[in-house]
Amino acid sequence: LSLMLAQLNLTVGAIEDNCDKVLAAAAEADRQGADLLVCSELALTGYPPEDLLLRADLMIRVEAALTRIAAWQGACAILVGHPWREGEALYNAASLYEQGQLVARYFKQDLPNYGVFDEKRYFTAATETCVVPFRGHQLGLLICEDLWQPGPALAAKAAGAELLLTINASPYDQEKPWIRRELMAERCDQTGLPLIYLNQVCGQDELIFDGCSKVFNSQGE
């Protein structure tokens, strides 16, 4: 299984431009023979979108962008983060598209509400685990804070995941690279699964997103 991790420079609110970057990355992944392009948490809106999530037109623009992604006919599948509304609930979501079809849609379970994060103001926390059969492998999908708590990763393992795939919008601070590394190694040790971690690279106001995407084997190395 070949994955391309897209550490894209995304802009909050620039949904159409962000979608262009996702599709350009998908075309490059296709040229290189990748099976799956992995994009970051809330890639279509940029992170953190904050009160833009309260605008009535936001989901119209997000749905238009997702329609463009679904229409892409390359051999490479696309995993992309975006907000998604069901009824009155707004979710922090990740969707997997393959050759015009929605294969899976996962909703974030653990919402951070400390420091620079205020996701509980906007999003509903989900409870469902998502393990996706994809080209002979079972992918356990996670979004950022889901990895910081043991429950979602262990639930994915119990549901048959063979690989943990987590998309993130994790801002930099001086200690964060080492904290992340220890955390990911711990999850691998707890689950016995390999882990892929994808983070964006950009600046949003006072926040810096430093990428540092990583691939760990099942021993946490």
Predicted segments, located by residue:
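Enzyme catalytic cores with a strong preference for nitrogen-chemistry domains
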Residues: 1-221
